[in-house]
Amino acid sequence: DSYIAFHGNDCYFGTAAKKKMGTEGYQVVYELKRVIGLDEDDESIDEDKEKWPFKIVGNDRGKACIQLELPFNGETITRTVDPEVLVAQYLNHLLEERVENRLRCKAVFTIPAKFSNVQREAMKSAVNQLRLADVRFFPEPTAAAMAYIRESPSIVDNSCIVVYDFGGGTFDVSVLRYSH
């Protein structure tokens, strides 16, 4: 669960953050992938803005940012944060739990095939904040095809692999030709 919950100076991630939904004094954000790299007035998030318990505001460049209302010492502090920063914070939390030496860590990140170049660059910006040794980015269906090839020893040289991704209202396709 890609949830982050804030309460004063405290921060919770994943399931622990999701459990804070609706709890007084906690600000919970999620679905950051739907916001990252977009302009504040992008129509693709208009419906989402109505259901999210957090506000989307524009920064000085018109980019969509998350506005947090955080209780602190009896007052409410308003903080505006770029989605890239929050994505990096979430990924950083995951790495702290699982990776001993980041400077040796190799990682593959998948990016939705429907992302624009601006959204892809925003995701790369978030990941680059993690200071990993070797990072690769692939569209989600391409990564699925590569995983299929890796896990299928029966694939012969010069095979054609087609992966259809029917997720989330999109229809994405990757076609790969495999050769040793």
What are these regions (language model features)?
Residues 83-84, 88, 141:
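Structural motif detector for alpha-helix initiation sites
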Residues 1-47, 55-60, 71-80, 96-180:
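Oxyanion-binding/catalytic loops of NTP- or PPi-dependent enzymes
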